[in-house]
From Swiss-Prot:
SUPFAM superfamilies: Enolase N-terminal domain-like. It comes from the Archaea. InterPro entries: Enolase-like_N, Enolase_N. This is Uncharacterized protein MJ0198.
């Protein structure tokens, strides 16, 4: 088998999602892979990639992701977004060299479990967000639910933000309406659908949350449903994972397993389609991208490529 050797890693500014971002490209002797990251200082990120990290990786095998990630961690770069961007671009180059999807490269050929994918559909000016969470038998069921929900919501709300969610003045005034809508769809489609809320601890502490099944806040609050927090707490059911804060794919793998060892569920937040592959590879049960991202579609694509797919439930 041909060795897959890293020959060049480069970075450049790109305009994507109405912002200047940085594209990191890894070229091997037989393949190419890339990732696009969002950073505060693109010029500094490009310098970190090309002048600090890239020279340490040239000449090494892209397929040895653990070793590559260890080299990344040994550099002087302390920006985890840059580190993760390079880690993903190398992993993509490696999977492309083997002509297999990224999820199979990271998780193995027998991977069959898919995550639930849930996105906000309604948000207010304070970024409080309502999230329908579907326990479905197929990703297509989730896709169809969002199509139906957005169609119904279009009759009551006129503005859609850049993330694909409809906007309102106060999300807490809209909870009964969305709860009723979801309950109607549950009965019509015979689906198990939870209603989630993403907010702040100080915002929800005096609110009526009796119609909410799943709550995302920074720290624990008194709540009877599923609780998702920024860090690991005894009261938590879910813990947020932001890949670009982890450093590398390998570091994220260990953190995800640490969360699971505590009896909790990790939730990957982010809009990179690579996160769909990482979630499938590492058996993460829940993905939280924006509706306008390509993540749900990427999980749908993955579903079509595996035998007997099974969507996680909680």
């Amino acid at each position: 088998m041909t060795n897959v050797i890293i020959e060049k890693i480069s970075a450049k500014e790109v305009f994507k999602g109405a912002k200047i971002k940085v594209m990191i490209t890894t070229m091997t002797n037989i393949s190419i892979g890339y990732d696009i990251i969002e950073v505060n200082n693109p010029e500094e990120a490009i310098a970190d990639v090309e002048n600090v990290i890239a020279p340490e990786l040239i000449g090494y095998p892209a397929t040895d992701i653990d070793f590559i990630d260890s080299l990344i961690c040994e550099t002087s770069v302390n920006n985890p977004t840059v580190a993760m961007g390079i880690s993903i671009s190398v992993a993509r180059a490696a999977s492309n060299s083997l002509d297999i999807p990224l999820f199979k490269f990271l998780g193995g050929a027998l991977t069959t479990e898919l995550p639930i994918v849930a996105s906000g559909i309604l948000v207010d000016k304070d970024k409080n967000e309502l999230i329908p969470i579907v326990m479905a038998d197929s990703i297509e069921d989730i896709v169809n639910l969002y199509l139906k929900l957005t169609d119904v919501l279009s009759h009551d709300y006129s503005i859609v933000n850049i993330d694909g969610a409809y906007t309102c003045k106060d999300i807490f005034n809209e909870i009964p309406k969305i709860r009723n809508l979801i309950d109607e769809i549950k009965e019509d489609e015979d689906l198990d659908i939870l209603l989630g809320l993403s907010s702040k601890k100080e915002t929800v502490k005096d609110k009526d949350l009796s119609q909410i099944d799943y709550l995302e806040v920074e720290e624990p609050v008194e709540f009877d449903g599923f609780l998702c927090t920024d860090s690991i707490y005894e009261e938590s059911d879910f813990v947020k994972v932001f890949p670009y804060e982890m450093g590398t794919i390998t570091e994220m793998y260990y953190y995800i397993n640490y969360i699971m060892d505590k009896g909790l569920y990790p939730v990957i937040f982010g809009n990179n389609s690579s996160f769909a592959h990482i979630a499938v590879s590492f058996k993460v049960p829940f993905l939280r991208p924006k509706l306008s991202s390509n993540v749900l579609n990427e999980v749908w694509n993955i579903e079509r490529t595996i035998m007997n797919p099974n969507i996680r439930r909680f």
